């Protein structure tokens, strides 16, 4: 059974992000089936910066949240930071066994450049198809969508979720301006999912014949859904749900 996708607006692993991290662990518990939940923090997007720091922050945060909620986790860095490590079959084996695969933020172009066609991405897809939670924060979330923007312009994402781009670090007071910029550079018909920091959405499929995908909001901020450039925005807060259309493969 395929696992849920989770998208996060950034500020991952900081104080205040605990509800979202606990939601990821709860979603992964069925795959773990009573053993320690295996968490792989994959700092690919941070490869130009401090990937080990990003991963260490993630490992510490998951361990802290698990202890608070009476869970046991085996959280570790899986250091995929370039083509060589993406081809490493030992790292791929760790990814294939994970119950939560978390892609923290960094540079938006790195994950879509490094992952496609690699052993690492094949292992992530295998784990996700087997029920693992696939989560991305900020640039990690952007990469999972069908399209993303970078400092060099727009580029295709990994198309795990389709029909929209993820807009991290979203704020209500600046959303209109953000949406206007989005309209200026987005491909025709592409929606935008805006996510505040320390806030994310977790996929909740609505059934095999559903025409939409449900996304449960978790965290202190808001999520914003604009179904097409210039369309009216719908917002939701923690515990509420947004729906995006199912885009056929």
Language model region names:
Residues 97-98, 130-131, 161, 188-189:
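Structured helix-beta-strand junction loops
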Residues 89-92, 97-100, 108-130, 237, ...:
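Mature, structured domains of secreted/extracytosolic soluble proteins
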Residues 104, 110-176:
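Class I SAM-dependent methyltransferase SAM-binding "motif I" and its flanking Rossmann-like core
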């Amino acid at each position: 059974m395929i696992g849920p996708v989770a998208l996060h607006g950034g500020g991952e692993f900081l104080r205040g992000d605990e509800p979202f991290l606990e939601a990821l662990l709860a979603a992964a518990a069925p795959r773990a089936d009573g053993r320690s939940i295996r968490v792989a923090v994959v700092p690919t997007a941070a490869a130009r910066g401090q990937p080990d720091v990003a991963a260490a922050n993630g490992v510490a945060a998951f361990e802290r949240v698990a202890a608070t909620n009476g869970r046991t986790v085996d959280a570790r860095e899986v250091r995929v930071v370039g083509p060589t490590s993406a081809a490493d079959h030992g790292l791929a084996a760790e990814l294939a066994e994970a119950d939560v695969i978390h892609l923290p933020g960094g540079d938006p172009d790195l994950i879509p450049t490094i992952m496609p066609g690699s052993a690492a991405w094949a292992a992530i897809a295998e784990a996700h198809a087997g029920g693992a939670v696939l989560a991305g924060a900020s640039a990690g979330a952007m990469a999972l969508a069908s399209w993303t923007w970078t400092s060099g312009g727009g580029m295709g994402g990994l198309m795990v979720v389709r029909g929209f781009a993820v807009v991290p670090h979203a704020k209500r007071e600046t959303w209109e301006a953000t949406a206007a910029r989005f309209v200026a550079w987005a491909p025709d018909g592409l929606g935008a999912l805006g996510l505040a920091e320390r806030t994310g959405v977790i996929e909740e499929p609505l059934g095999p014949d559903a025409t939409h995908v449900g996304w449960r909001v978790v965290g202190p901020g808001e999520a914003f859904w604009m179904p097409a450039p210039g369309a009216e925005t719908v917002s939701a807060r923690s515990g509420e749900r947004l729906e995006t259309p199912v885009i056929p493969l």
